[in-house]
């Protein structure tokens, strides 16, 4: 039997921010299933997230998650960590691919200043940045007009591309701690992002797209979910536009993942 690849967004997909006592039994059931499938050598489990690696570790500790996905792609999949001998180790091979082109904070600041001056808007850093980052993320608060927001952000993406930089935007997720009525603005190297990480794994493990199941809940999952044949948007997603585009999990959070992973490995989605 060939291996299958399971891909999970983290915040509000693999991890529920407001996990309560009732949720814990569903969480344990999900982890038990993933552990069993991993031990049977049936699946490779991967987290793809916009969060930092340390943020993922901290959140896993909050709910005492015990299962360790084989790979965690953090910082909008610009960093790759692999579980090896009881700890996560960053992949130097992936790092070299990501940093194969210049990626300078000064250039990104110039891009944002250009758009800020043109439209009299502000881009707010989401965290304190350190040297040699591979992911710079900002908030853009809505102007109050959705069409105007998109126009400004699409100009930003095009202008960044003209400067040989990759920018993405998606609606912020308040359930994951983001502000209301805002957008996430993400800058990564060209060789990064959830779709890039997916294709990297397909090549690494020689896994066809039909053998991949992906889950997500927000805009930064759209590109990679669109690429897959078997993709689910979490039914707990707050993105109404994405809900019209993707199949929804039958149940939210841990229950939804457990059900659809079971059906996937049982071959119910094969055709």
Curated annotation (Swiss-Prot):
All disulfide bonds of the chain are none
Superkingdom of origin:
Bacteria
Question: Molecular function (GO) terms listed?
Answer: magnesium ion binding; phosphatase activity
Tell me which family the UniProt entry assigns to this protein: Belongs to the HAD-like hydrolase superfamily.
Stated name of the protein: Uncharacterized hydrolase SAR2294
Record keyword Methyltransferase present: no
Keywords annotated in UniProt = Hydrolase
A Gene Ontology cellular-component term: cytosol
| InterPro entries, per the entry | HAD-like_sf (IPR036412), HAD-SF_hydro_IIB (IPR006379), HAD_sf (IPR023214), SPP-like_dom (IPR006380)
Task: Provide the E.C. number(s) assigned to this enzyme.
Answer: 3.-.-.-
């Amino acid at each position: 039997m060939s291996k299958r690849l399971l891909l999970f967004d983290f915040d509000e997909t693999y991890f529920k921010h407001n996990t309560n006592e009732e949720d814990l039994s569903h969480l344990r059931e999900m982890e038990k299933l993933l552990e069993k499938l991993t031990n049977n050598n049936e699946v490779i489990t991967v987290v793809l997230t916009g969060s930092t690696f340390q943020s993922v570790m901290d959140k896993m500790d909050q709910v005492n998650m015990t299962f360790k996905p084989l790979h965690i792609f953090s910082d909008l999949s610009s960093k790759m960590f692999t579980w090896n001998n009881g700890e996560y180790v960053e992949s130097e091979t992936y790092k070299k691919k990501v940093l194969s082109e210049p990626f300078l904070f000064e250039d990104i600041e110039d891009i944002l200043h250009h758009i800020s001056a043109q439209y009299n808007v502000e881009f707010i850093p989401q965290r304190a940045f350190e040297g040699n980052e591979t992911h710079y993320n900002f908030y853009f608060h809505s102007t109050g007009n959705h069409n105007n927001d998109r126009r400004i952000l699409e100009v930003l993406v095009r202008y960044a591309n003209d400067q040989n930089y990759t920018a993405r935007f998606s609606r912020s997720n308040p359930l994951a701690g983001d502000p209301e009525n805002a957008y996430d603005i993400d800058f990564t190297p060209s060789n990064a992002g959830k779709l890039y990480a997916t294709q990297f794994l397909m090549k690494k493990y020689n896994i066809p797209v039909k053998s991949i199941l992906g889950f997500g809940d927000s805009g930064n999952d759209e590109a990679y979910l669109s690429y897959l044949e078997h993709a689910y948007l979490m039914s707990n997603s707050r993105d109404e536009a994405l809900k019209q585009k993707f199949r929804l999990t039958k149940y939210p959070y841990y229950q939804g993942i457990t059900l659809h992973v079971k059906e996937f490995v049982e071959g119910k989605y094969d055709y």
